[in-house]
Amino acid sequence: MTTAAASSPRTYQVRTYGCQMNVHDSERIAGLLEQAGYLRAGAADDTPDVVVFNTCAVRENADNRLYGNLGQLRPRKDQHPEMQIAVGGCLAQKDRSEIVRRAPWVDVVFGTHNIGSLPVLLERARHNAAAEVEILESLEVFPSTLPTRRESTYAGWVSISVGCNNTCTFCIVPALRGKEKDRRPGEILSEVRSLVDEGVLEVTLLGQNVNSYGIEFGDRYAFGKLLRACGDIDGLERVRFTSPHPKDFTDDVIAAMAETPNVCPSLHMPLQSGSDDMLRAMRRSYRSERYLGIIEKVRAAMPDAAITTDIIVGFPGETEADFERTLDVVRAARFSSAFTFQYSKRPGTPAATMADQLPKAVVQERYERLIDCVEEITWAENRRLLGKTVEVLVAVGEGRKDERTGRLSGRARDGRLVHFDAGSLAGQVRPGDIVQTVVTYAAPHHLNADGEPLAHRRTRAGDAAEAGQRPRTAGVSLGLPTVGAPPPMPPAASSACSC
């Protein structure tokens, strides 16, 4: 029998669904697999040795999407029996053995608390020729200790906490991610510095509720202190965070945002509903007046701040008057963008069994009215930037039409998406570089800048992108098994082409 060590390295692919937390978890999954000797499958490889689904249980029809994708893989699995399929993330934490019952060709099911076990579970499933299902009820190892394969040379996610202590009636995340666990500030800042040392310019601090950071070690001002400490890190040009909860938003955090030059003038703060009755039913612990009061304070401290939000339409019991109150708050808040969702039942949440579930047609009609209202406001807010100079961090994959239009794309400091013409700098601007340019056109969801750029600054992140390099966070040694023997690293190329 040929041993794994003697065979060629096995390849992997990670498919991610859901929020930024899942995106960052997938970076950890990739880092774990590469540390264990796997190689990332090429884009054209439709039969990798391992396919990992990192799932979401929050989005509508998340289970149907997963089982549909698993069904599409079954013929390939039948043709290539050595192929392994693993399912992790929130849906795996929720459904557990149900996944293997409905899709018996799945090899491994792992949860949100034991990502670090994946390489061992894959090896065990291969050895035993049987599915491995391992779901833990509490965090095994804080995810920051796991190796990470970063997808960007210029921007990185850094978790400051996992889990959530809130009990929103529509949300299943606390049941799947557990109670809030906070990293200590020194660990967070060490990770941020290591990313900056590798050329990263922008860091997003991640947590289910970043404003409650510090509750585990008894410091209610910890998040403001953390933002200010990030301001002392040389080379860190942009700091963002997501998501805060309005009930925990303090004046100290607003002051820290305004006082710290590298904290971006942007804020994503979920509203969910503008109706106090709906907020009470959602168990959101704030009311619309407090929400608008926070926005007023943020804009007083940071007049150019772009504020974005999440809104749910059609929550059980929502009346036309409740919905009109949501529109009123949207008009008063003047969001620069909004993620809007039609309510759908999440099994296991209190809202799923509430009376007065709304007909689909009513929810759809309100949803369309909300979209129209939001787009009217975001378009007006974007038009205010016509003729203004913006600083753009050039990104990869932000502009779906870039190849056809000849533009490049990136994010302004306030988080707005900017498509720009490189002009005489065409071929010189790389992902991770900084460009200053003037806004010439505004749409509801983006800005265009079609004049000659005013300035271009080459960065170490751009150098790394050009060389095909990515920053990595090594984490700590977990004694993981090595599967196969990775080939030597190729020489760096000399040139090359988001509660």
Curated annotation (Swiss-Prot):
Principal cellular location given in the protein's record: cytoplasm
Bias-annotated ranges (Basic and acidic residues): 449-463
Domain Radical SAM core span(s) in chain numbering: 150-381
Localization, UniProt: Cytoplasm
Highest taxon of source: Bacteria
Record note on cofactor: Binds 2 [4Fe-4S] clusters. One cluster is coordinated with 3 cysteines and an exchangeable S-adenosyl-L-methionine.
Listed GO CC annotations: cytosol
One annotated GO molecular function: N6-isopentenyladenosine methylthiotransferase activity
Catalytic activity entry: N(6)-dimethylallyladenosine(37) in tRNA + (sulfur carrier)-SH + AH2 + 2 S-adenosyl-L-methionine = 2-methylsulfanyl-N(6)-dimethylallyladenosine(37) in tRNA + (sulfur carrier)-H + 5'-deoxyadenosine + L-methionine + A + S-adenosyl-L-homocysteine + 2 H(+)
SUPFAM superfamilies registered for this protein in UniProt: Radical SAM enzymes
Alphabetic keyword roster: 4Fe-4S, Cytoplasm, Iron, Iron-sulfur, Metal-binding, S-adenosyl-L-methionine, Transferase, tRNA processing
Keyword Transmembrane helix attributed: no
Segments of this protein annotated with the region Disordered: 449-476
Alphabetical list of InterPro entries matching this protein: Elp3/MiaA/NifB-like_rSAM, Methylthiotransferase, Methylthiotransferase_CS, Methylthiotransferase_N, Methylthiotransferase_N_sf, MiaB_methiolase, rSAM, rSAM_horseshoe
Pfam families in alphabetical order: Radical_SAM, UPF0004
Named cofactor requirement(s): [4Fe-4S] cluster
Domain MTTase N-terminal: 10-127
Domain TRAM, first and last residues per copy: 383-453
Family recorded in the similarity comment: Belongs to the methylthiotransferase family. MiaB subfamily.
Function of the protein: Catalyzes the methylthiolation of N6-(dimethylallyl)adenosine (i(6)A), leading to the formation of 2-methylthio-N6-(dimethylallyl)adenosine (ms(2)i(6)A) at position 37 in tRNAs that read codons beginning with uridine.
Assembly description: Monomer.
HAMAP family hit by this protein: tRNA_metthiotr_MiaB
Name by which UniProt lists this protein: tRNA-2-methylthio-N(6)-dimethylallyladenosine synthase
High-level lineage: Bacteria, Bacillati, Actinomycetota, Actinomycetes, Micromonosporales
Underlying gene: miaB
